[in-house]
Amino acid sequence: MSKDTEAKSEEIMESKVLWYPDSKRNTQTDRFRTLVNREFGLNLANYNDLYQWSVDSYPEFWAQVWKFCGITCSKMYEEVVDVSKRISDVPEWFKGSRLNYAENLLKHKDQDKVALYAASEAKEEIVKVTFGELRRDVALFAAAMRKMGIKIGDRVVGYLPNGVHAVEAMLAAASIGAIWSSTSPDFGVNGVLDRISQIQPKLIFSVAAVVYNGKQHDHMEKLQNVVKGLPDLKKVVVIPYVRSRQETDLSKIPNSVFLEDFLATGKEGDQDPQLEFEQLPFSHPLFIMYSSGTTGAPKCMVHSAGGTLIQHLKEHILHGNMTFNDVIIYYTTTGWMMWNWLISSLAVGASVVLYDGSPLVPSANVLWDLVDRLGITIFGTGAKWLAVLEERDQKPASTHSLQTLHTLLSTGSPLKPQSYEYVYSCIKNNVLLGSISGGTDIISCFMGQNMTVPVYRGEIQARNLGMAVESWSCEGKPVWGESGELVCLKPIPCQPTHFWNDENGSKYHKAYFSTFPGVWAHGDYCKINPKTGGVVMLGRSDGTLNPNGVRFGSSEIYNIVEAFDEVSDSLCVPQYNSDGEERVILFLKMGPNKSFSQELVGKIRGAIRVALSARHVPALILETKDIPYTISGKKVEVAVKQVIAGKEVTQRGAFSNPDSLDLYKNLPELQNF
């Protein structure tokens, strides 16, 4: 190990503890560990022991999760998984079992308990839906779908905001065995068609208009253009949503019908239809999810009903310590995998809060108001939003009670170390801050929140149970306390069963198994702390920087740069010359009323040199007016890398601010390298 690396490894080991677990050790993870010890005659003393057993004995582990989390099935499995198969073989899980995802979310005996709270920027009123009402509505949706000919394997799409109708339509599709896919109304026509035209849906649900940032936005023109690009559609169901039916003209959209009229076709006389759950294999497709599509057509990942269910139950119950008494919100749209993850909380019997609108309108308190109003216990958001609150000097701890809140989750991008301090000083000092990380590729997390181990500043607490995750060097060797590629060594039930339109599996293989044969390479760069077991995410592998043979992740730079008050955001990318030499370019977006200066550049260079090393200091530091983000709030380094190399980025539908890419074209400072 070099002196430089040794120093960094020491530094990572000395993280500050911000939260300690309850000494009573009576979490669901502790109870699960006790059961495993009893069942297998083991003496697993703590989370680390349990984690090691879960990856060494993964078939036994997943069988115990099935039992502990109470999965409902009509036929029990014959085999958990074939242990002779590698993760790259995409083995079948729980062969022989028959179940239904929707049934597992709607099985609760207390039909009067609130399943969904729906709040929106558009209305003061919060809509409540009990489990009994949700079952009744899903039955009606499903009956209408069956009536129009939707059957097992057909694709049903929601181009919908995060509200009750999206949940009902998704559960109805799942009850039949149809495959659900969704995207949010903030996606433009091209962004939607790049995704859903690939899967040839028969049915689409959408809305007439939405409200965001205090304004009503018409959605009909976009919907009309989307429908034109989907020749296999049999029906378009329109929900007036924030408009009245009278104000909505369906005449330009073929095969369109209002939701009310569509649901009426599911009724037989005055009788409410019975809810029937098709009993399907564990590996039956449930969701089609999409890669970001920032560098090419989005990949269509097919996720199984059983794999999604068991993985989400594991994360909610064992990692989140969730029970039926919890009330959870995740600030998300239907176009992000966190929506699917959130809705699976219904399987635990928890109440789910759906919010549609801006998290900053009418004020930055809107979501904290909901915490106090609804008694929210688990609150999830993107790391970027927490940074924005800190920038605005928001202090929810002094304006809100937040008494019920026990867990605050963050994902979407690496959570900066200073955001940890902000949460504990300005939001709540005894909350579990769970930075969670995984991806759409597994519709879940590799590492995340954990009620049994401490929270260290700047670190994700631990690798999740059953996820054989390591950080590997380019040579394919595990590294500890050093930067490396995030890999998963053993099969997991939540990996996609396949990609849509990938007959021979070549796209799937290229996406995950072309870097290290037989091992899943996730495309993230990370560092695992050998002392704490915590993980630091360092950005996407395609955003990895390697000037002068020093390999590091862009987040290492962001954590330093964005601690400067003058800097509101930053972007760090490599530039290559014709000989293949690399230099690092750092772009700074200045904060309000702050100006870019050579004095600031000097300070930033000095801070990077001290915190990392002289070899981490960017070759050039330039000002930019904007930084490109995807619609789900992820910074897009790889697209800027392409632009500064003189390449055109054609897939602009995935960006929330596509015009920002033009700011990086033909920059004089980047010529003649």
From Swiss-Prot:
Tell me what reaction this enzyme catalyses.
Answer: acetoacetate + ATP + CoA = acetoacetyl-CoA + AMP + diphosphate
Q: Mind telling me which CDD domains this protein's record contains?
A: AACS
Known Pfam families for this protein?
Answer: ACAS_N, AMP-binding
What biological-process terms (Gene Ontology) are attached?
fatty acid metabolic process; positive regulation of insulin secretion
Q: Which GO terms describe its cellular component?
A: cytosol
For this protein, the record's InterPro entries field holds: Acac_CoA_synth, ACAS_N, AMP-bd_C_sf, AMP-binding_CS, AMP-dep_synth/lig_dom, ANL_N_sf
Q: Which family does it belong to?
A: Belongs to the ATP-dependent AMP-binding enzyme family.
This protein's name: Acetoacetyl-CoA synthetase
Species of provenance: Danio rerio
What gene is this protein a product of?
aacs
